[in-house]
UniProtKB/Swiss-Prot annotation:
EC category name: transferase
One Gene Ontology MF term: uracil phosphoribosyltransferase activity
Functional summary from the UniProt entry: Regulates transcriptional attenuation of the pyrimidine nucleotide (pyr) operon by binding in a uridine-dependent manner to specific sites on pyr mRNA. This disrupts an antiterminator hairpin in the RNA and favors formation of a downstream transcription terminator, leading to a reduced expression of downstream genes. Also displays a weak uracil phosphoribosyltransferase activity which is not physiologically significant.
CDD domains, per the entry: PRTases_typeI
Assigned protein family: Belongs to the purine/pyrimidine phosphoribosyltransferase family. PyrR subfamily.
BP GO terms, sorted: DNA-templated transcription termination
Catalysis: reaction(s): UMP + diphosphate = 5-phospho-alpha-D-ribose 1-diphosphate + uracil
Name the UniProt record assigns to this protein: Bifunctional protein PyrR
Subunit structure: Homodimer and homohexamer; in equilibrium.
HAMAP family, sorted: PyrR
Length: 173
């Protein structure tokens, strides 16, 4: 297996800043926006976007943590550790995740989200879009488009979990 770093910590920070600026530009009513990070790394990315929004606009947007495991079609998990302290009904919810691949994680996140309330709008922000969709899902905000083959894997590391920020591609051939 070959591993190659394709995004370093500086590039990751720039991608998160770019996503944040796009969120500001596309959302006229930022006070109606709720950020929802998909566990695990999506939560930390959501917190970073929340921090940048505070720095740039002086806003403290609410943030929630979505646990998609109970909503996946390939797992059987009873415990749901979702933490959503704000009512999302009528809100513009931005789902945030590290990698968009087949779309199945996002489908599960949307299922979880609508079980909590009825948002006015749901959009998607991802650090990396690697292609290979199995469901008709696309990201509204993308940090990096990194096309991959079926034998490659994208690994996102964040300092809060992994001790460093980077994105690597692993070739399993």
């Amino acid at each position: 297996m070959k591993t190659k770093e394709i995004v370093d910590d500086v590039t990751m920070k720039r991608a998160i800043t770019r996503i944040t600026y796009e969120i500001i530009e596309r959302n006229k009513q930022l006070d109606n926006v709720v950020l929802a990070g998909i566990k695990t790394r999506g939560v930390f990315l959501a917190r970073r976007i929340q921090e940048r929004l505070h720095q740039l606009e002086g806003l403290d947007l609410p943030i929630g943590e979505l646990d998609i495991k109970p909503f996946r079609d390939d797992m059987r998990v009873e415990e749901d550790t979702t933490l959503m302290s704000v009512d999302i009904t009528g809100k513009d919810v931005i789902l945030i995740d590290d990698v968009l691949y087949t779309g199945r994680t996002i489908r599960a996140a949307i299922d979880n989200l609508v079980s909590l309330g009825r948002p006015a709008r749901v959009s998607l922000a991802v650090l990396v879009d690697r292609g290979h969709r199995e469901l008709p899902i696309r990201a509204d905000y993308v940090g990096k488009n990194i096309p991959t083959s079926s034998v490659e894997e994208i690994v996102v590391e964040v300092v809060e979990v992994d001790g460093r920020d980077r994105v690597s591609i692993i070739d399993s051939t």
